[in-house]
Amino acid sequence: MITPASPEDLRIIAAQLGRVPRGVLGVAARCGDCGASSGASPASHEGGISADRQRGISAGHQAVNPVGYPSDNPVGRLTDFPAGQGDSVPAGHPAVIASAPRLPGGEPFPTFYYLTCPAAVAAVSHLEANGVMREAEALLEANPQIATAYARAHELYIRQRTQAGEAAGIGEVPEIAGVSAGGMPRRVKCFHALLGHALAVGRGVNPIGDWVLDRLAELPASDPHRWTPATCAWKLDETAWEGDL
């Protein structure tokens, strides 16, 4: 589920990215606490927002925005939840952030679930550099069940992004209508986006994202590119980000 990004989270995310993060709606997954590693039911992540917050959206509540933007601020200022109104923030550094579908500068941004953990990014980049994406493409082409689930993941991704944007007061973003991320619904183009989706919503939603996570976990323990959210060894370099947010 999406939880508010604290000031410390934003500092960590800036260090992870090497820049000031833009359009952060919240933290969608954390290393050590990702839904993909906890066996969470996909249904519990519908919309990427907790059930209590879903009810608030359905009832039209605007006092506390479910993803961190006030309703009168459509595209940009990072804000905190009022005390006691958000879900409790789990332990662990951010692994995936939920990004606004339109960034503060007005640019459309289709990648709702954005992978930020440097260790995860490096591990996935290693898979891509070694041609593993072709294996995923072949799997998608050969298995109709996986292809069907992948297409459903595409539809859910767009629904979640649209819902979060509406809840944040951003409104429609026609430039990215029908566009999700990672090559969905028929191609495999970016493991980073697909892994980010899988970590954010939990297993059983994005079959290729789950497959990528399994490939990383199956590497030998001695392999520096082995990665799981539960065993992530990335540590914040205290000198990595010293600028203002």
Per-region residue spans from a language model:
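Preference for intrinsically disordered or flexible, low-complexity segments
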Residues: 1-39, 91-245
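Intrinsically disordered, low-complexity tandem-repeat regions
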Residues: 40-44, 48-88
